[in-house]
Curated annotation (Swiss-Prot):
Its EC number is 5.4.3.8. It catalyses: (S)-4-amino-5-oxopentanoate = 5-aminolevulinate. InterPro entries: 4pyrrol_synth_GluAld_NH2Trfase (IPR004639), Aminotrans_3 (IPR005814), Aminotrans_3_PPA_site (IPR049704), PyrdxlP-dep_Trfase (IPR015424), PyrdxlP-dep_Trfase_major (IPR015421), PyrdxlP-dep_Trfase_small (IPR015422). The lineage of its organism: Bacteria, Bacillati, Actinomycetota, Actinomycetes, Mycobacteriales. This is Glutamate-1-semialdehyde 2,1-aminomutase.
Length: 441
């Protein structure tokens, strides 16, 4: 494997050695593509441990974590309440293949927070949640077509990979080989934040669209919030046309508020998908919604879905502990920390006259190297993304770990304190200078 010469000391590092070793037995050396640093160059850091806001790699380097495991760690890493819950659950058994009381408690916690969700099914990943929600929408409506938005990522479900964000955006791929033409034909893709395009799609496919699936606020083309009235417009268009509205809150759920994005705009979906925060950092996710729709799910109804490890007791314990520890003080801290980071980023880039927009979607944020606001995927791709690798490494080399992609949201945790922001503030001038000096290829 070739290691980027722009990554200093990499040939001598333990991370580099592990990356070489991993590449022999793991495709690309990683188990999720964005971790490979392909879009920013250099060698991925292999992490040994984490605590609070700090990641420590196998070479002993510490980083302020602005990835938070891609969203779940709102409390910070190794939070005592979550660790204790996991240890206690693991001591009584790792998996039973039978129901537990904890599953009911986690479902009750979700239903109690998000009013439109009346029943919930636990699964193992956000991909499983969106796949199952779409299948249920098709089964409930008797229709086949799904409408999604360019740049919105809903996991690696075949039907939902068309023009998706996240890793596909990072690698510049419109879709994935292996997705059949028949699957693609049932997926309608329109620009995000464009209600006219949605209305036209319904008119052109009258009586055939089962559901519209949208990120409640986009985080996989960077942080792009819905424009005022957009989610409300989706609610009306789906209702008027007999389709279901699936709100994908895998990223926003229980991060942007205790009730997710629903807690911010109050727009009710028919189905919801959750993951990340509700997992406490372990493999767990969920989908849920209206009771009459969920009644079509097996064993109550004919739409099949199952999972050997769904509702795993250790993952359930982590999720419950994380949600219960996330009191209003945690959400207030997330708001403050997101606002502070946004100001630091903008001030540093402004000082170097770098064109930029630091955009937020709730407490998620991202940096676009653009003079203009970004409201959709086309505008995100039109930004000067070639500046991002230099900016990224300027931060990483000084102890700050942002997402290794221009198209991923940045995340803060409630564990961040003055010292964390001091490290970020010290690193940003160098990173901003590097972004300013970057040359378009």
């Amino acid at each position: 494997m070739t290691v980027s010469s722009g990554d200093p000391d990499v040939h001598a590092s333990r991370s580099a050695q592990l990356f070489e070793r991993a590449d022999l037995v793991i495709p690309g050396g990683v188990n999720s593509p964005v971790r490979a640093f392909h879009s920013v160059g250099g060698t991925p850091r292999f992490i040994k441990e984490a605590s609070g806001y700090t990641l420590t790699d196998v070479d002993g380097n510490d980083y302020v974590d602005l990835i938070c495991s891609w969203g779940p760690m709102i409390l910070g890493h190794a939070h005592p309440a979550v660790v204790e819950a996991v240890q206690k659950a693991a001591a009584t058994g790792l998996s039973f293949g039978a129901p537990t009381e904890g599953e009911i408690e986690l479902a009750e916690e979700i239903v109690g927070r998000v009013a439109p969700v009346e029943k919930v099914r636990l699964v193992n990943s956000g991909t499983e949640a969106t796949m199952s929600a779409v299948r249920l929408a098709r089964g409930f409506t008797g229709r086949t077509k799904v409408l999604k938005f360019s740049g919105c990522y809903h996991g690696h479900v075949d039907a939902l990979l068309a023009d998706a964000g996240s890793g596909l955006a990072t690698f510049g791929l419109p879709t994935s080989p292996g997705v059949t033409g028949a699957q693609a034909e049932d997926t309608i893709v329109v620009p995000y934040n464009d209600l006219d395009a949605v209305a036209q799609a319904f008119a052109a496919n009258e009586g055939r669209i089962a559901c519209v699936i949208t990120e409640a606020a986009a985080g996989n083309m960077g942080a792009v919030a819905p424009q005022p009235g957009f989610n409300e417009g989706l609610r009306k268009l789906t209702s008027d046309n007999g389709a279901l509205l699936i709100m994908d809150e895998v990223m926003t759920g229980f991060r942007v508020s205790s009730a997710g994005w629903f807690g911010l705009d109050g727009v009710a979906g028919d189905l919801y998908t959750f993951g990340k925060v509700m997992s406490g950092g372990l493999p767990a996710a969920a989908f849920g919604g209206r009771a009459d729709v969920m009644a079509h799910l097996a064993p109550a109804g004919p739409v099949y879905q199952a999972g050997t490890l769904s509702g795993n007791p250790v993952a359930v314990a982590a999720g419950l502990a994380s949600l219960r520890a996330a009191d209003q003080g945690v959400y207030d801290a997330l708001e403050r920390n997101s606002a502070t980071l946004r100001t630091l980023l903008s001030d540093a880039l402004t000082a170097e006259s770098v064109p930029h927009r630091v955009q937020t979607a709730g407490t998620m944020l991202s940096v676009f190297f653009s003079e203009d606001p970004v409201t959709n995927y086309a505008e995100a791709k039109a930004a000067q993304t070639w500046r991002f690798p230099a900016f990224f490494h300027g931060l990483l080399s000084r102890g700050v770990y942002p997402p290794p992609s221009a198209f991923e949201a940045w995340f803060v945790s409630a564990a961040m304190d003055d010292r964390a922001f001091s490290i970020i503030a010290d690193a940003l001038p160098h990173a901003a200078k590097a972004a300013a000096a970057a040359v378009q290829p």
